[in-house]
Amino acid sequence: FIYRLAGREREKSASYYTPEVLTKCLVKYALKELLKDKTADEILHLTVCEPAMGSAAFLNEAINQLAEAYISQKEQETGEIIGYENRFNELQKVKMYIADRNVYGVDLNSIAVELAEVSLWLNTIYEGGFVPWFNTQLVNGNSLIGARRQVYAESALTTTSKGLHWYENAPERVPLGTERKKKTGYSQIYHFLLGDPGMCSYTDKVIKGLEPDNIKKMKDWNKKFTAPYSTDDLVSLRRLSGIVDDLWQSQIALRKEVEEKTQDALSVFGYADNAEDSHTTIRQKDKIYSALYKSEHMRNAGPYARLKFAMDYWCS
């Protein structure tokens, strides 16, 4: 595949080629401390995320080095050495396992995401192997800007003190597996349920000249976004945050269900995979993902689609 962009397009999309010597060096030293004192099985199950993956240069290098580290450590632990004639195939299997289960990536360029899928497959392909499916792992999006699992303290929504308003401070992250505070008066509210000064803010002189009356109405409307919330507002925000909590947990369970329905079992050197093989084609996996997870062409939206809609609406 040859992917060529003109200079300006390349600059606008931040599409730059990373030389192999650089990816090898950076990945080597990133893994050096991380892999210290880890068992082979721990190495095999490390997850890797590249927030600006491009066509997966760094992901491929991480897979290569993790696979080599796993086999080397497993040989030391078991005392069993893979024969030269089988080593390449066994290495490719380990690379396929890591790519299929533990690799995640995001990129602004949708074409780059498609190229990354092909690149990972070509890097991990082996005789008799399955075609990997990356729909739940490699996505087109912006990893820097957007709604997140972050909250503001309830007190920041009602204060009139300058510098203490929610929109003047960064929200607090709530890691998966931990709960936000829910006690009335001390609860935390998800940031994407709240207004922001940047909403409907137009500074373009041309637009101001074309629609002065509407711009004034929008300015007045914008002021309401950042006004302190009332007691009734807080009741609604607590309820909505509770619904978000439920949707998040349901989405996690749904994701696990999708992964179980689309998973391909793969045992590698020194590790027997106990996952149940889905025996599904790429097309069948796409249908499962579209209907069950994304709720496309379905009468009712599932938890992922509902949560995504709310977060996308805030971003827009």
Which residues make up each language-model segment?
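SAM-dependent methyltransferase catalytic region
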Residues: 1, 6-8, 12-316
